[in-house]
């Protein structure tokens, strides 16, 4: 392992020491709590949407969340280990067969729905 990988590993450990990042994948509906600074006030803003892409690159890992806001599609890219992210909560698991769901950009309404992933009996028994 080279020096850069070692430093990145230590930085990830430092950034995740006070928060837990759940396992999520494209197709999942997540709620991302983001710290927003307005003037001298700091508040937490919830951003809920479908994960359409996830990029696993160590410290540079990121994911894109898409939601429909007042009839208009809005996408936001988040850095996974950013200190601005207060927390991530998985609301619903989606059953998709693609790693990148960019095709949802052209779809709206019923055609943009994602089937919910059902938990198998073996997985329930393991819990």
Curated annotation (Swiss-Prot):
NCBIfam families given in the database record: rplS_bact
Entries under HAMAP family matching the protein: Ribosomal_bL19
Entry keyword annotation includes Repeat: no
Coiled coil: none
UniProt entry tagged with the keyword Repressor: no
Pfam families recorded: Ribosomal_L19 (PF01245)
Protein name: Large ribosomal subunit protein bL19
GO CC, any one term: cytosolic large ribosomal subunit
Function: This protein is located at the 30S-50S ribosomal subunit interface and may play a role in the structure and function of the aminoacyl-tRNA binding site.
GO biological process, one term: translation
A Gene Ontology molecular function term of the record: structural constituent of ribosome
Keywords: Ribonucleoprotein, Ribosomal protein
UniProt record similarity statement: Belongs to the bacterial ribosomal protein bL19 family.
């Amino acid at each position: 392992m080279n020096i850069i990988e070692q430093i990145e590993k230590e930085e990830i450990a430092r950034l995740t020491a006070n928060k837990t990042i759940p396992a999520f994948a494209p197709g999942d509906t997540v709620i991302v709590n983001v710290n927003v600074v307005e003037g001298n006030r700091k508040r937490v803003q919830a951003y809920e949407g479908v994960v359409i892409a996830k990029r696993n690159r160590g410290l540079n890992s990121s994911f894109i969340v898409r939601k429909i806001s007042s009839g208009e599609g809005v996408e936001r890219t988040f850095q996974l280990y950013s200190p601005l992210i207060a927390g991530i909560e998985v609301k619903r698991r989606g059953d998709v067969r693609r790693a990148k769901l960019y095709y949802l950009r052209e779809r709206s309404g019923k055609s943009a729905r994602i089937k919910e992933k059902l938990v198998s009996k073996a997985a329930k028994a393991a819990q």
